[in-house]
């Protein structure tokens, strides 16, 4: 995860030897030398920046070409199985340049899967996809992980979607990994809180302090107060604020999400 310009694509290009780092080392599948690292790349598939294929060829023809240059046996069977797996079984004579963005992403992943990789790297794969395309992509990636045992590295800034898909997050800022956290760890750290929106902020704070005795913080400039409690506390808060004639615009229960966590780290 990282903002635009944080170094996500640069890091991926270094891992795949498309760029060379000024300093530091890369260990891939426990490689201990540059030669071992290069050999380990045979176990890696990737789609970096945007899917690349021959514009004038169909999906089948593109995979046939890559099977030929990679000397992949039983090409016809491999191609049909791969196209079916990524959801492109019936594209017929349509050529790559006429594909939708979602179809291009699927073909890019199909090309990356031909060599049966253990590690798949995808750079901003859901950019530009519509909601249906994003959901289909998510289901495909989950299948690849669960059915084929492929480890998948995804770079993205669409955090809500990553949260549904990933089980570990690395946060990149200004070229450095500043935090690595599992989904389980994040959920343990996430705070439950009650959001109160009121035009009478000062009076509301006074009531919270004197009558309810829960910790809270004011979030400016939205007249929003975050009260650190659980859902059962909402009724008591409503009761005390109503008795004090505090105007309540909105009140609801919330939990810190990945976007808020990321923003706090990089700002």
Go through the PLM ranges and name each one.
Residues 1-154, 159-173, 177-179:
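ABC transporter nucleotide-binding domains
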Residues 33, 37, 183, 201, ...:
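Residues at or immediately preceding the N-termini of alpha-helices
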Residues 192-265:
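Short, charged/small-residue-rich alpha-helical element at the C-terminal edge
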Residues 176-199:
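Conserved beta-strand-loop-alpha-helix hinge in the C-terminal portion
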Residues 20, 186-189, 217-219:
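Short, flexible turn/loop "capping" segments at secondary-structure junctions
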Residues 45, 71, 87, 170, ...:
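A generic structural signal for secondary-structure junctions
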